[in-house]
Amino acid sequence: MRRGFDPRRTALAVADVLREHTPGVELLMPEERLGAPDELVSHVLHTESAFSVKAVVWQPGQLTAIHDHLAWCAFVVLQGVEYETLYRDHGDHLTEIGRAANGVGDASGFAPPGDIHRVHNTGYVTAISLHVYRADLGAEGASVRREYDLPLR
């Protein structure tokens, strides 16, 4: 990953690569694909100073808090469907600015600022996605910069 590239363009380029070379769920062991009933499960697959890769397992009904990220991110869905809602921050409230239903092979990328979203598995099967972050998850611990608890208008 060369330095100096525009973060948003880089995230979209990585998403293109993920879309073209989507791995199967077999990159996780069968027991890792189960998830957990009380929370989504992340499996960090690779981490270094330039980027990190993790797989996220979502059981039906699980969702994230509304959040943004430390750096750019790209993802591809390996199993199920992940519903994403995008938001804009107005300081004292958020507004919804978009929605997407991402199925198997769908990939996307985004970068701060303007990367506020929530992801939800509203389906009946466990969803699995692969994420690439421009963050060292080994050092940072997580990719989330901020969780939002603002009213929606």
Where are these regions (language model features)?
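A short glycine-rich, His/Asp/Glu-containing loop-to-beta-strand
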Residues: 30-62, 107
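Short beta-strand His + acidic residue motifs that chelate non-heme Fe in jelly-roll/DSBH
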Residues: 65-67, 84-85, 110-111, 116-122
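Glycine- and acidic-residue-biased ligand/ion/polar-headgroup-sensing regions
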Residues: 71-89
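A short hydrophobic beta-strand segment most commonly corresponding to one strand
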Residues: 74-76, 124-140
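Short acidic-glycine-tyrosine-enriched beta hairpin
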Residues: 89-117
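Domain-scale activation on soluble regions of proteins
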Residues: 99, 121, 132, 139-153
